[in-house]
């Protein structure tokens, strides 16, 4: 739904289907290879032309890291419920990672046990629709999630029953991503701040925003922080509101680009 709305507004919308699944870009601490995967994708799809970087959660963090690494690729940066982790909280994450205790406090404690196989797409839909977090999603978004987020399962437990599906995004890779959350964002932003305008969309009930806080994010985006009703997954809960908010920001960014040849670096306090 989001992509359709943005394309209908005249934008060319592209995205990497699954981060972390390409052997050339493994998941490691602080996600340098995932950042490079995004940069390679941008440079291949839009050579020499900066783009609007829009990302939710993981996508927002990687977009920020990409904009810091190679400022020339970013026309603007819009982070969707990807609160910037710095200071003592970032140091705590670093220590927990080093001690191999991060799984006790990160979402990986759930993802490592996540169900990943079903006898049919209908069974997968019923499974997620019954879960509280997914029940809040717009029905059409959940349908898209099943259609695009699952794939035929060649290792279905019941070989006599065709139609089995599994999660397309492997749970062990999702778990590894959670366990390698970047703890160096503050250092990256201090040394190589984005040279493009930056904005942030936050969920009013986002646990992630509440846990991380918004001090570093506000220092990065200044007045360009907007709230949308919902949890961390508000783009799936309120897709129309999210799509409209993104389009407003992109229009604002385009106007800024036309009026000024280059934006000053956005440096956190």
Ranges and model annotations:
Residues 1-11, 15:
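Short, surface-exposed "cap/lid" segments of acyl-processing enzymes
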Residues 6, 66-70:
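Aromatic pocket-lining residues of Rossmann-like dinucleotide-binding sites
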Residues 14-54, 68, 84, 93-96, ...:
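Active-site loop/oxyanion-hole signature of alpha/beta-hydrolase fold enzymes
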Residues 55-59, 63:
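Gly/Ala-rich beta-loop-alpha elbow adjacent to hydrolase catalytic centers
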Residues 68, 75-117, 210:
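Flexible "cap/lid" loop of the alpha/beta hydrolase fold
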Residues 115-204:
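Alpha/beta-hydrolase
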Residues 189-230:
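Conserved loop-alpha-helix segment in the C-terminal half of the alpha/beta-hydrolase fold
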Residues 230-243:
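Catalytic histidine-centered segment of alpha/beta-hydrolase-like enzymes
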